[in-house]
Amino acid sequence: MAAVSMSVALRQTLWRRRAVAVAALSVSRVPTRLLRTSTWRLAQDQTQDTQLITVDEKLDITTLTGVPEEHIKTRKVRIFVPARNNMQSGVNNTKKWKMEFDTRERWENPLMGWASTADPLSNMVLTFRTKEDAVSFAEKNGWSYDVEERKVPKPKSKSYGANFSWNKRTRVSTK
């Protein structure tokens, strides 16, 4: 029943678009591209294999990653909000939650002296909108996690005149 009503709605949409295109063509006499109804015919044809695949049940595809089992099940992740850059006064990149993996064994490459690792997840940092999203993702993948709560700085009330007060040690002599 839903497929029939969907195709009727699709047919009406296509006819409206075609009518608008024909009206625009007759008014402006400029060549315009007409929307063909082949997509509607394709949707009506139930015997072809080009239909959309619909899955009735939710499938778990986390086991299809190709990452070895030792890197998946024994991981510990840290969920945090990055600190503000000390060199700037802006708060960019401090609103989203980040997830980074623990550090595994590293060694120095004897030829070049570079730091090497066999861990495919060591340099990966994931970004999430909320803490709950990050925690649910870690639980879904079977990782243990530590959550570092967001540190909100307490605003300091200052006045501009305090920079020029004579009774405080705010002025530095140059001699």
Curated annotation (Swiss-Prot):
The family this protein is said to belong to: Belongs to the complex I NDUFS4 subunit family.
The species this protein was found in: Pongo abelii
A molecular-function term among this protein's GO annotations: NADH dehydrogenase (ubiquinone) activity
Description of how the protein assembles with itself and partners: Mammalian complex I is composed of 45 different subunits. This is a component of the iron-sulfur (IP) fragment of the enzyme. Interacts with BCAP31 and TOMM40; the interaction mediates its translocation to the mitochondria; the interaction with BCAP31 is direct.
A Pfam family that the UniProt record links to this protein: NDUS4
Function: Accessory subunit of the mitochondrial membrane respiratory chain NADH dehydrogenase (Complex I), that is believed not to be involved in catalysis. Complex I functions in the transfer of electrons from NADH to the respiratory chain. The immediate electron acceptor for the enzyme is believed to be ubiquinone.
UniProt name for this protein: NADH dehydrogenase [ubiquinone] iron-sulfur protein 4, mitochondrial
Any single biological process term in GO: mitochondrial respiratory chain complex I assembly
Alphabetical keyword list: Electron transport, Membrane, Mitochondrion, Mitochondrion inner membrane, Respiratory chain, Transit peptide, Transport
Annotated region (Disordered), positions in chain: 149-175
GO cellular component, one term: mitochondrial inner membrane
Superkingdom to which the source organism belongs: Eukaryota
Membrane keyword on record: yes
Location relative to the cell: Mitochondrion inner membrane
